[in-house]
């Protein structure tokens, strides 16, 4: 099992860190391919029925998460669309992209905050330290996503990532 997630706010950035018991190249790969992302992206009780990835600078990642857990009350049946536009990719080491809330056509939802995400993949002798830095345009935008439960959602998502990494290494 990997380590616990560490989260903190630094100015307008939400910083998340966690060590995964998997090699860096594998952790990087499961962030770069739709077939992998469909298996683990999103909090528990949510699936990814739609996901496309054009993994290159200027390329787009477009996905839909759907709540399939009846125990999640008003969220059951809800769809949440997202879109990322990749800016910089250093193979095995770094992904920088802008993350948007979107509709099914990939149009940005104007009244929801976007964020510039920098993901760093650090080799730790067969394990990988993943550091995600999400920079928001304002304190209000950051507070909006914190109030939406972003930290819990990412914790559950990264728990699912750990489980997926374990399954593909067997």
Features from the language model and the residues they span:
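Hydrophobic ligand-binding cavity/cleft-lining segments
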Residues: 1-48
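Short beta-edge strand/loop motif at the mouth of beta-sheet-based domains
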Residues: 15, 35-81
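Hydrophobic pocket/interface hotspot
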Residues: 27, 37, 61-63, 86, ...
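Beta-strand/loop substructures that line and gate deep hydrophobic ligand-binding cavities in soluble
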Residues: 98-100, 106-152
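Short, highly charged C-terminal tails/helix-capping segments
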Residues: 165-170
């Amino acid at each position: 099992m990997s380590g616990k997630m560490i989260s903190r706010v630094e100015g307008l950035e939400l910083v998340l860190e966690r060590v995964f018991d998997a090699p860096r190249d594998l952790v990087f790969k499961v962030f770069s391919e739709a077939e992998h992302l469909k298996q683990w992206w999103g909090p528990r009780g949510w699936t990814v029925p739609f996901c496309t990835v054009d993994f290159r600078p200027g390329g787009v990642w477009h996905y839909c998460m759907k709540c399939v857990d009846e125990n999640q009350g008003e969220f059951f049946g809800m769809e949440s669309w997202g879109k990322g536009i990749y800016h910089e990719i250093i193979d095995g080491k770094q992904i920088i992209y802008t993350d948007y809330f979107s509709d099914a056509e990939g149009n940005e939802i104007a009244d929801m905050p976007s964020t510039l995400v920098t993901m760093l993949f650090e080799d730790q002798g067969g394990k990988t330290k993943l550091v995600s830095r999400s920079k928001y345009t304002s304190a209000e935008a950051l507070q909006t996503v914190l109030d939406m439960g972003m930290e819990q959602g990412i914790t559950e998502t990264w728990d699912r990532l750990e489980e997926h990494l374990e399954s593909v290494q067997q």
